[in-house]
């Protein structure tokens, strides 16, 4: 199975910095045929990223950081799935802990976003804490569950240098895989220094945020993942 590395820029970087970053990681991808890099820039930078990747042969999939739970219509300020599709988006994060915490998104909100994404052929990347697993899967139909990818991200372990304990990650990933055959990633303080230990676990990829902002740091993670898998 192809190992996934998902880089989430959150609200970092300006447009020129994004394209410079894309160029900088390209050589590492040429040496990593069994790995797929997914990149989630700011929604504002998806058009420029799409244009850049359309003219440069870099094997990177574009990811949206969020999507409207509504179809096209009178929803001021919302960006719907069909609009994301127009700019080459193939995946979209949904249910990130920061969206659940700061924007009070519910499990049903996430399920509505999943429905919109799947209707446009975009793969949802559903972020889950341990506490989200049961209610989030309950909000999804059986058909939807296997058409997504999943990211276990314990909120307490985001933005630091230490991951969740490996036994906790292993147990939680197993819980998620009881519901689905889809890929399951781990996210939460993934760094070049600790990613090798994560590769001993039955995960299908990693979600990288802070450590992805520096191209050399992300390149080191790609290299480790590529040689270990």
List each language-model region with its residue ranges:
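Glycine/small-residue-rich loop that forms an oxyanion/phosphate-binding "nest" at active or ligand-binding sites
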Residues: 54-114
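Active-site rim beta-loop-alpha module in soluble metabolic enzymes
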Residues: 116-185
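Glycine-rich beta-to-alpha transition loops that act as phosphate-gripper elements at the mouths
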Residues: 66-67, 74-75, 108, 128-130, ...
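Glycine-rich phosphate-binding active-site loops on the catalytic face of alpha/beta enzymes
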Residues: 93-102, 154-161, 202-221
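Catalytic cores of alpha/beta
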Residues: 131-139, 190-204
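C-terminal helical cap(s) of enzyme catalytic domains, especially alpha/beta-barrels
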Residues: 113-117, 211-229
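Conserved N-terminal beta1-alpha1 strand-loop-helix module at the mouth
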Residues: 1-76, 139-147, 157
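Hydrophobic faces of well-ordered beta-strands that scaffold small-molecule active sites
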Residues: 5-9, 37-41, 62-65, 92-94, ...
